[in-house]
Amino acid sequence: MLNEKKPVEQLTETEAAEELAFLVTELARHDALYHGQDAPEISDADYDALKRRNDLIEELFPALIREDSPSRKIGAAPSLTFQPVLHARPMLSLDNTFSDEDARDFVAGIYRFLGKLPDHSIAFTAEPKIDGLSMSLRYENRKLVTAATRGDGTTGENVTANIRTIRMIPQTLPADAPDVVEVRGEIYMAKSDFAALNAEMAAQGRPLYVNPRNTASGSLRQLDAKVTASRKLRFFAYAWGEISAMPSDTQFGMVETFKAWGFPVNPLMQRLSSADELLQHYHHIERERPDLDYDIDGVVYKVDRLDLQARLGFRSRSPRWATAHKFPAEQAFTRLKGIDIQVGRTGALTPVARLEPITVGGVVVTNATLHNEDYIRGIGNSGEPIREGRDIRIGDMVIVQRAGDVIPQIVDVVMDERAEGAEPYRFPTTCPVCGSHAVRDINEKTGKVDAVRRCTGGFVCRAQAIEHLKHFVSRHAFDIEGLGSKQIEFFFESEDPTLSIRTAPDIFTLERRQEASLTKLENIEGFGKVSVRKLYEAINARREIALHRFIYALGIRHVGETTAKLLARSYGTYEHFRAAMVDAGSLAGDAWNELNSIEGIGEVVARAIVEFYKEPRNLKVVSDLLEEVRPESAETRVSTDSPVAGKTVVFTGSLEKMTRDEAKAKAESLGAKVAGSVSKKTDIVVAGPGAGSKLDKARELGVQTMDEDEWLALIGG
């Protein structure tokens, strides 16, 4: 990670902006892997740590909060396999708590936000957090009309036909149900049904499924509803979206209503009145967890009264009145059989542990991530000892941790079980794929050695070249249907010059080369006339492409989808962008300064872009690519109607018509950034009685000031 995990409070403003840009890209990538592809590659705990770091930086540097910040997002974009459904009300995710202390802070924060209320006067509900797939069921005139996944929270996937096969979901509602109601909850697969399904797969000699959650998700996304029907999916109802008439004024009452309408609800849900009671129920559910016939990963707390929920409102991606108290990660012991090295698109050598099969949290684990060379040696990202400095050696008895549906990780070693004479692991200094030197670069900014060892072979390295091509055709880049991983590997390995694809421009010359060839692609096993025709159509459909997609597809290190959009908006055309990057090559002058001044582009990212354009081989590939495709000019950003959107606001003094938290939440919901101090970047200071130095400084700097009534008039109440 950037800044070597420097404490947030020690970051400079430039470093903070740089790291926020990195976190946007990194979290968006993991969101897509988890929500869109059901293929997460980091643990829930690591993901949550990235989110917490992002939130801490934004809290200290509110002026740097980006429009595409992870704090404003919910999940990943929906797949194109099913028709999109626009949710009438967004399906928000929940903030997480990880300790009893965090849970107490959640309760205390509710009381602080709402103001003067007696202790124990606010009731809460507590229920298991089901590890499944979020679902919204829309009923009109008491008939099920649409079922949609959460997707990115705003737009989901229409899976109505498949949902109709789940017997425990009502097709119609009783006569007393509202005309319009969206019942929301979780689709899951019972552990017993999962075990039976895998037993059936084993009997047929077919590959086993990994875990119930991924199996439920895959089952729900089947194009053939008969397959879904055979998978015995289940449902728990616990929330709602659009509803034409409220049947209750409490969370608990709403869930009881769902039960009366025929929906399954969780029997472990309780209504409680204090943090102590919530924690008591949390630990009760934690003890019951192994015996439940469904996977859970925590307990959800919600304020019970709906009028208080309305007052508390929402953050950009989550309700303020609810939180998910997560369980600790599950662990098990097994033997490390070996360490394999994988080579990624940027040349990173990633060690992966081969383990004796072990069941962790109901899932058979055979591989685990080892992160990097230092992690194996017992050294953390900042050079600090981890595992008390214990290294990891082949043959060791290790502790494996699985947190969520991800590649597990080795968290410790049982030293008493280490074999006498076991040798320390020697990380390779050459690429296992191409034999090129593998080096650990020096970070020019920090002077520290990079934690990752990288192959220097570049496009000479088969692994890097193939991964570059896979990235180029991926969904957020050129998105060429029919060019998946297997097809890319086939074309790359082909020795026929009319079939070979070694660099991105080769994709767009394939059809021309095939016209003059006797070896027709349509005659090769796995292809046919129809599939080849569709492949050429998909390739030709991408000869004009959005500028940000083009930049992202180049595979420049540190340039993710979000950074590519920033660059596209800032430079407008590819010609302008390329010329500016070449001019910035000296790391000085107007072009370099302009690049670094883009909000969200820090020095590390800027250097990576400039270095890309210094490499003649990259320039040749891009030049050849531009002979085949045309990047479109970037669209200008659409402005919002809110009078305070994009403005930085500071509240000071006492507010009489709302609490400070309510004022902040309202401002942020209108697109404003709320800061804690006044600076030249401040646009508005809202001053109540008792305003002091902040108001004085605002006047000194010429910042617009107003009282609470003027503020409410400005934002429309």
UniProtKB/Swiss-Prot annotation:
Its EC number is 6.5.1.2. It catalyses: NAD(+) + (deoxyribonucleotide)n-3'-hydroxyl + 5'-phospho-(deoxyribonucleotide)m = (deoxyribonucleotide)n+m + AMP + beta-nicotinamide D-nucleotide. Its cofactor is Mg(2+); Mn(2+). Residues 639-717 form the BRCT domain. Gene3D superfamilies: 5' to 3' exonuclease, C-terminal subdomain, 6.20.10.30, BRCT domain, DNA ligase/mRNA capping enzyme, Helix hairpin bin, Nucleic acid-binding proteins. Zn(2+) binds at residues 431, 434, 455, 461. It comes from the Bacteria. GO terms for molecular function: DNA binding; DNA ligase (NAD+) activity; metal ion binding. One of its GO terms (biological process) is DNA replication. This is DNA ligase.
